[in-house]
Amino acid sequence: MDKQIQMVQQIVDDMLAKRESLRVLEAGCGSRSFIQFGPKAYLVGIDISAEQLQKNNLLQEKILGDIQEFPLQAVNFDVVICWDVLEHLPQPEMALNNFLQTIKPGGIIVLGAPVVSSLKGLATKYTPHWLHVMLYRKVIGNPLAGTPGYGPFKTFLKSAMSPKGIRRFAVENHLRIDLLESFEGVMQQTVRRKYPLVDLVFRAVAPLVRVLSFGTVTPHTTDFIAVLRKPAPDARDRQAEPAFAGTTVLNTAH
């Protein structure tokens, strides 16, 4: 995931270089941020967990609320970041529409989430929550997993937050896709590295899964990252271009 974070960091750095300041919303902010913004940025975080907000020392402003329903001020932010949150929402399309109306022209929406159609995504969606907690404690090594304010949290993995759903959202709302890339996440990498037998079985089963699912299930790509840009007013005046024109779209999954 470091590569994907670096790609987003470069996009943010380019914005910082061209502007005197940035207003940034960390949606579902938790207690930390993956991206560095520096002194030019005013950071606002929203989360449903008071414990997570209390532990986050990077924010200038904290909002206790649900990103699906909280009335975010219109045209208010240059950057909206939503990382590993959409999968936990029963109505992710509500959050996406909330981001759309609060982002300024020329601003970006950064999304990171599991691939719904991956083996990890399907296993996460259809296995009990207690199993997720056990994996976080035993495999990742987080003894606080599942306690109040700590993940893993309940997941829904709705189709609206799949890479295909995000592409559709971008096209329908005239957003440019600056980046859309799928990759193998830390959890699966850790399990395969820590348990060689699991890795052996995975390597044997993965090709069969791809064939039997007609390519719709992606064993190796578990997560994706997307950067959607709201066109500036002058861009809207020019002749309309395809949503993918001049963008980086790599290794995407359905």
Residue ranges and their predicted role:
Residues 73, 116, 130, 233-235, ...:
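Intrinsically disordered, low-complexity segments enriched in proline/serine/threonine
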Residues 28, 106-107:
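Conserved phosphate-binding and hydrolysis motifs of nucleotide-dependent enzymes
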Residues 1-75, 79-83, 96, 159-160, ...:
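Conserved N-terminal segment of class I S-adenosyl-L-methionine
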Residues 90-99, 108-227:
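S-adenosyl-L-methionine-dependent methyltransferase catalytic module, highlighting the catalytic core
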Residues 232-254:
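Intrinsic disorder/low-complexity segments
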Residues 84-88:
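Short catalytic micro-motifs in class I SAM-dependent methyltransferases
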